[in-house]
C-alpha cells in the first residue's frame, strides 16, 4: 500500500488542509484530514489554504499564500516557518538538494531557499538579468517567451528549472529559455519531473 498527501483549503476560510489518502486494493481511502492554521493569522489570505507541498523526510514544507511552514508528519504541528516580505501568492514548491524552489506567482519570481542558511536567491522573471537569456536577434518569436503568472515549478535530472505557465498555457525550461511541448488548450497548473519524464495537469483537466 502507498499513501498520498494532498494539500488544499476552503474558499471561505484561511486555514490550510493536509489530507492523507491511502491506496488500497479496494481503492482510495482517506486516512486523515488535518487542518493547519496559518502561522500568522493577521496576514492570512482568505480562500488560499495550502497551495503547494514538498516532502522532506518526516516533515513537509507547505506554502500558504505568503509564508512557508515546515509541518511534522507525526502530529501535523508547524515546527518552523520561512518568511519574506516579497512572498506574494506562493504556489507550487519543490525540494532539490536541500533547497526549496518556490513559484512566487504574485511577485513574478522563482525563489530558491537554502535550507541550511534560510538565504533566499530570487530570480526576477521580469528583470533584465533573466531577459539576457533571450537571443539578441531571432526571427522566431516562439523563442522569446513572455513570463507572466507561473503556476508550478520542478527540477529535471539536468537541474534545469521547469515552469508551468498560466497565461501562455505552456511549459518553460527557464534555465535554457526554451518552451517544452506545444501550447495547450487551457492553463498549465501543475508540473512534475518523474523518472525522466515531465508530467503536468491543466485547468481543463488534461494530464
Describe each model-derived feature in a short phrase.
Residues 6-16, 21-22, 61-65, 102-107, ...:
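Conserved beta-strand positions in repeat-built beta-propeller and related beta-rich domains
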Residues 55-57, 95-98, 155-158, 193-196:
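Residue-level detector of Asp-centered blade-edge/turn motifs that repeat once per structural unit
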Residues 24, 48-49, 89, 106, ...:
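Beta-rich catalytic cores
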Amino acid at each position: 500500500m502507498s499513501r498520498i498527501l494532498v494539500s488544499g483549503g476552503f474558499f471561505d476560510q484561511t486555514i490550510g488542509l493536509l489530507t492523507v489518502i491511502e491506496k488500497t486494493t479496494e481503492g482510495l481511502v482517506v486516512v486523515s484530514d488535518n487542518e493547519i492554521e496559518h502561522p500568522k493569522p493577521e496576514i492570512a489570505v482568505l480562500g488560499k489554504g495550502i497551495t503547494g507541498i514538498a516532502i522532506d523526510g518526516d516533515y513537509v514544507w507547505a506554502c500558504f499564500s505568503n509564508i512557508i511552514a515546515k509541518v511534522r508528519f507525526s502530529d501535523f504541528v508547524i515546527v518552523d516557518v520561512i518568511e519574506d516580505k516579497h512572498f506574494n501568492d506562493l504556489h507550487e514548491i519543490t525540494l532539490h538538494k536541500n533547497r526549496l524552489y518556490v513559484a512566487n506567482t504574485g511577485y513574478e519570481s522563482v525563489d530558491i531557499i537554502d535550507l541550511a542558511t534560510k538565504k533566499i536567491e530570487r530570480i526576477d522573471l521580469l528583470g533584465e538579468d533573466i531577459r539576457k537569456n533571450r537571443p539578441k536577434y531571432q526571427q522566431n518569436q516562439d523563442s522569446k517567451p513572455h513570463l507572466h503568472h507561473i503556476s508550478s515549478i520542478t527540477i529535471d535530472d539536468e537541474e534545469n528549472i521547469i515552469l508551468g505557465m498560466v497565461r501562455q498555457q505552456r511549459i518553460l525550461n527557464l534555465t535554457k529559455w526554451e518552451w517544452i511541448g506545444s501550447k495547450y488548450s487551457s492553463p498549465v497548473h501543475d508540473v512534475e519531473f518523474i523518472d525522466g519524464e515531465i508530467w503536468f495537469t491543466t485547468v481543463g483537466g488534461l494530464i
